[in-house]
UniProtKB/Swiss-Prot annotation:
Keywords associated with the record: Chaperone, Cytoplasm, Ribosome biogenesis, rRNA processing
Protein name in UniProt: Ribosome maturation factor RimM
Keyword Repeat: no
Gene source species: Agrobacterium fabrum (strain C58 / ATCC 33970)
UniProt entry tagged with the keyword Acyltransferase: no
Length: 188
């Protein structure tokens, strides 16, 4: 059993594939075929899985793990999430404007005056562009676009992101109000 200090979700096991213990796996890696390049995978309860083989499947990869040799054993893994330690991710391959989602979580979102809008609690990718979820004390969670217009600067060492709250949709543009003081969203 292994316990990870800073776990990063890499994959989720689906159903069994065939009779020899292979499983279908959805990966959260840039290259699904590279899943085995990160070392052993660990479940939330500390079980360690060594990848013996990875091959392409339809919309997934098909993986064979050491010690999983038949369909019954493979079926027992259905739904398991697989993690690695954050330190196993290669930082040297990132460009200056690239970040791992896990590194963004916990960063405080502030504007140019230093006003806090909460901390990044999650990063979502729905296909049309990434969104950052901000949560703060006394505030409802808010989703902001992870775009150059909304997120002006990311400072991992300082633990903060500099945002433009208007571009992020957190405050109204005063120029958008009509003569009655109403914004296009029906707010004063």
């Amino acid at each position: 059993m292994a316990k990870l200090e800073n776990p990063i979700l890499m994959a989720k096991i689906g159903g069994a594939q065939g009779l020899r213990g292979e499983v279908r796996v959805s990966t959260y890696t840039d290259d699904p075929m590279a899943l085995g390049d990160y070392g052993n995978l660990v479940t939330a309860d500390g079980r360690v899985f060594e990848i013996l083989e990875v091959r392409e499947g339809k919309n997934v990869v098909v993986v064979r793990f050491r010690g999983i040799n038949d369909r019954n054993a493979a079926e027992s893994l259905n739904g398991l999430e697989l993690f690695i330690e954050r330190d196993n991710l290669p930082d040297d391959e990132l460009d200056d404007d690239e970040f791992y989602y896990a590194d963004l979580e916990g960063l405080e979102a502030v504007d140019a005056e230093g006003k806090s809008y909460g901390a990044v609690s999650a990063v979502y990718d729905f296909g049309a562009g990434d969104l950052l979820e901000l949560k703060g004390a006394g505030r409802r969670p808010a989703l902001i676009p992870f775009s150059e217009a909304a997120v002006l600067e990311i400072d991992l060492e300082a633990g903060r992101i500099l945002i433009d709250p208007m571009a992020a949709g957190l405050i109204d543009n005063p120029d958008d109000k009509d003569q009655n003081g109403m914004s296009p969203f029906g707010k004063k």
